[in-house]
Amino acid sequence: MLNLTKDKRKSLGSFYTPDSLADKMVRKFKSLEGNFVDFTAGDGSLLRALNRAGVDWSRLYANELDKSSYENLLKMNPDLPRDHVLNMDALDDECHKKMLEITGGQYQVILNPPFSKANKIVSKILEFMPE
């Protein structure tokens, strides 16, 4: 898990998803086919849960806004292709346009967004999510 101070996590609204919860979230998917995106990836716990469930790293994509969290995400998930990871604001249209581009326009979303921005982030994802 990240070595961020409690104050830093609070300022980011960041509380990383425990493995047990991540695994439960993954089990709720009807299908594990296709690509998966976590727009608020943190340390990548949801991506690792998908991988544990059999989803190949080549079908996993991530975005993380905070630079130190982004760098830690890359370190903690060495099998995640680097060109599948963005360091952008999930509330920015450009983040979603870039994700559509790198995924080929097809993906399912898994995320546990910062509580303080959850509604805005989910609304933005729905605006750009492929049908």
Residue ranges and their predicted role:
Residues 1-131:
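Class I S-adenosyl-L-methionine-dependent methyltransferase catalytic core
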